[in-house]
C-alpha cells in the first residue's frame, strides 16, 4: 500500500483511517462500535443470504473467498461488523498496515459492485470496481473505488485501490 489518503477506511481496505477527511489516530479503539449483525441477519454485502451463510462464514472460519468479488464483499462486511483480524488476514503482506483504525461515527450503509475484471478461480489477479455508501455523524457519503486483488499462498488478498471520484 504505497499511498494512503485521509478517506474512510475503505471496505476493500486501502486507507488506514475510518474517518472521511480525517487522519489515523492511535487514541481510537481498534474495534468499531458496529451495528448488531447476527448469523441470521441479512448479509451487509448485499447478496440475498444470511450473514452466517455468506460473508460470516469467511470471517469465522479457515475458509477463503473463492473469487476477488466475494473477497471484496466479505471485506466490506468486515468493515460493517468491525472485524479487524479478518481485514488484516485478507490484506496483501506488502501493503498491510499494522492495524485498522475504525471511526465510531462512521456507518457503512450499502455496497454496489459495478464491475469485476478477472479474479476467478482461473486467475492470479483481479479487480473489483464498487461504490460503498456510508454515513458519518449522520451525513451521507459514498466511496467509489477500483480495488486490486491477487493471490497470496493460494488465497485472494486485497492489494490496493484507486479512488474514482
Say what each PLM segment does.
Residues 53-55:
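Cysteine-centered loop/knuckle micro-motif
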Residues 144-165:
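Short beta-strand edge/turn micro-motifs at domain boundaries
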Residues 60-99, 104:
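Core segments of small alpha/beta cavity-forming domains
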Residues 104-142:
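Surface-exposed, charged secondary-structure patches
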Residues 36-49:
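Short Cys/His-rich zinc-binding micro-motifs
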Residues 49-51, 60-61:
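Secreted/processed peptides and extracellular or luminal domains of membrane proteins
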Residues 1-32:
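Short Lys/Arg-rich cationic patches that frequently serve as NLS/NoLS or arginine-rich RNA/DNA-binding motifs
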Residues 2-7, 46, 138-140, 153:
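Intrinsically disordered, low-complexity acidic regions enriched in Pro/Ser/Thr
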Amino acid at each position: 500500500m504505497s499511498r494512503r489518503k485521509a478517506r474512510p477506511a475503505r471496505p476493500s481496505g486501502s486507507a488506514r483511517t475510518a474517518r472521511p477527511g480525517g487522519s489515523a489516530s492511535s487514541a481510537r479503539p481498534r474495534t468499531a462500535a458496529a451495528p448488531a449483525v447476527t448469523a441470521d441477519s441479512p448479509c451487509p454485502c448485499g447478496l440475498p443470504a444470511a450473514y452466517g451463510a455468506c460473508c460470516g462464514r469467511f470471517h469465522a472460519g479457515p475458509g477463503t473467498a473463492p473469487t476477488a468479488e466475494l473477497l471484496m464483499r466479505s471485506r466490506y462486511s468486515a468493515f460493517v461488523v468491525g472485524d479487524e483480524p479478518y481485514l488484516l488476514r485478507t490484506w496483501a503482506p506488502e501493503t498491510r498496515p499494522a492495524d485498522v483504525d475504525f471511526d465510531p461515527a462512521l456507518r457503512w450503509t450499502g455496497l454496489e459492485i459495478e464491475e469485476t475484471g478477472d479474479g476467478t478461480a482461473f486467475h492470479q489477479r483481479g479487480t473489483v470496481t464498487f461504490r460503498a455508501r456510508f454515513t458519518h455523524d449522520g451525513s451521507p457519503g459514498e466511496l467509489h473505488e477500483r480495488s486490486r486483488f491477487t493471490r497470496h499462498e493460494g488465497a485472494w488478498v486485497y492489494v490496493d485501490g484507486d479512488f474514482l471520484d
